[in-house]
Structures are given as C-alpha cells and as structure tokens.
From Swiss-Prot:
Originating organism: Natrialba magadii (strain ATCC 43099 / DSM 3394 / CCM 3739 / CIP 104546 / IAM 13178 / JCM 8861 / NBRC 102185 / NCIMB 2190 / MS3)
Pathway where this protein functions: Cofactor biosynthesis; FAD biosynthesis; FAD from FMN: step 1/1
Keywords, comma-separated and alphabetical: ATP-binding, FAD, Flavoprotein, FMN, Nucleotide-binding, Nucleotidyltransferase, Transferase
Cofactor(s) this protein requires: a divalent metal cation
Keyword check for Ribosomal protein: no
Full protein name: FAD synthase
Gene behind the chain: ribL
Amino acid sequence: MTNDNPRTVIAQGTFDLLHPGHVHYLEEAAAMGDELYVIVARKSNVDHKKAPICSAAQRRDVVDALEVVDEAILGHEEDIFVPIERIDPDVIALGHDQHHDADAIEDELERRGIDCVVDRASGRESTREDEVLSTRLIIDRILERRDR
C-alpha cells in the first residue's frame, strides 16, 4: 500500500569528512519518516567550529550518495530556515551532539507557521578501538600521523 502522505524528515549538518557517526545519525533520521532530506551547511553558517575542509558542493554530493538519503541540498547562505520552509517537513532530526537548542528551533518554526516536531537522534558508541566518530578527531589523527 502506498502512503499518500509520506512523512518528511530533515536532517542537517556540516558533514565534513563523513564518518560512521554521521551515517548513524542519518540512518536514525531516515527511520523517523518516509523521505529524508539533508541540509548541508554552507561554510558561512558554520560558526561554532572550524571551517569545513571540503567544499559545500562536495559534502552535499557525498551525503546525497548515501542510500538512506532521498535528497541532499545546500543550506541557505543567510537564513537557515529557508530550505526548511520550502521542504515543509514533519520532523527535524537533530544530531545527538549538535549545538542547536530544540526549543528555540520549535519557537522559530511556530513563528514561521511550520508545523513539525523537533527530535534528537541518539549517539553512537565506537564499536572498535580504532574507530573515530568525530571529524575533529579524524583531523587530529591525520595531523599526528603526518608529523611522524
């Protein structure tokens, strides 16, 4: 039976140097609905950590290649809510460690007339001793090994 009203989910993030933690987040987000759209942050919107290494287009293309993702798009340069308004999701899935305040997002969504739930995905523990689940830690490991 086909669902005439598919449940649309948005996940968002920087997704620089894609790693298993990103994949876990996107798999959980996809499980929250029927269609998963991923908004990939532009460099101009990444102010809570160092700028991404890879270009926005490259990060979008890598995320878009994942089977669980229906469509990956670039975020808006100035207003992060513009693509959310266009997609009009049922759910916004936040990553377990993302800095966003769910209550503040819900307030802004309500102000803009967007009726959706904000949920937070769970974290993922390393399953192997050598597994790295953080872009920052991947970069640190690269720098450490290059200094040898």
